[in-house]
């Protein structure tokens, strides 16, 4: 028994030492401003994370990785030695010095983008298991109301079908005065859309499909060269001048030769923000005042996969004659991917729309093993009690 216990302790010690936590901040060389959505990739493992709005990142460096690849579409790629180093202050040089040129196609833009979508979907391996870190943060009347996160395995049989297993999770509602007042006045429970559908939505490129099919959007394509030398095309979309309902502006970036989609970004167009209307949700009507969505795909050693997606949405909720400011953050970070995985028994799959019913459903500090994208400094200060 002692030998077994000793072996177990030794194994645990080796597992902890097998990766080291490195942290850093990345800024623009010329402006000294932080750069968001920079990808940090292990040079052998291919594991990745991204920087937050403050340019900060943290990365559990696997033992086989000796370097970090620092990569952003608008900046020159860097490789940094990670040996015996725990913190980084990185300056990146912009690679976008010239204006992007308009691309004249031999086909329609809709056909061009549909080709990029089809090519990207065909590149995804079939029968996947994605080990992910999922997080959502809910604000009520501009005050933090609820926080949830989880280690979730997404099992994809195809780009149209998946199931999930929630391995461990946390759901915490804050007890500040704003939360107490809201609870005393309302029985409405706010939550993000079904978290089980997050991966399918991204693999289907549903937002882009909607945009290119909507006649209220002006579409054009430009060409640029990424910081690593890859030639890229950029789909630009904005509401047309007389748009009545269209509200989003953004880009979709894909390879000019391989047609693989690298990045999708969308924001509310300031010029057409008045087009926002109240829309019926599950249990209330909602009108957006802020919308920011970013999805990043990673092509590493010929393997193409979803790497990260995030949403920040704020607005006003209406229930009868009661109006409430509601919004928050949703993030999904893919940690590892297995191909041709065995599908678990059906009874192990989670079927609820959100994590709230699970409460505090964990035995380990699972969030520490992921390359979790740091929250803003203000949000982290408010969440300190949760991580104890």
Question: Predicted regions span which residues?
Answer:
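Short, surface-exposed beta-strand/beta-hairpin micro-motifs centered on an aromatic residue
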Residues: 54-61, 87
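Short, acidic Ser/Thr/Gly-rich low-complexity loop/linker segments typical of extracellular
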Residues: 45-56
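Extended beta-strand-rich segments in extracellular/periplasmic secretory proteins, especially
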Residues: 111, 205-256, 260-266
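Short Pro-Gly-centered beta-turn/loop motif in secreted/extracellular proteins
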Residues: 32, 58-65
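A short, solvent-exposed loop/turn motif at the edges and junctions
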Residues: 70-80
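Surface-exposed, low-complexity/disordered segments
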Residues: 93-218, 226-231, 283-388
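Structural motif
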Residues: 21-35
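Bacterial Sec-dependent N-terminal signal peptides
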Residues: 1-25, 40, 99, 388
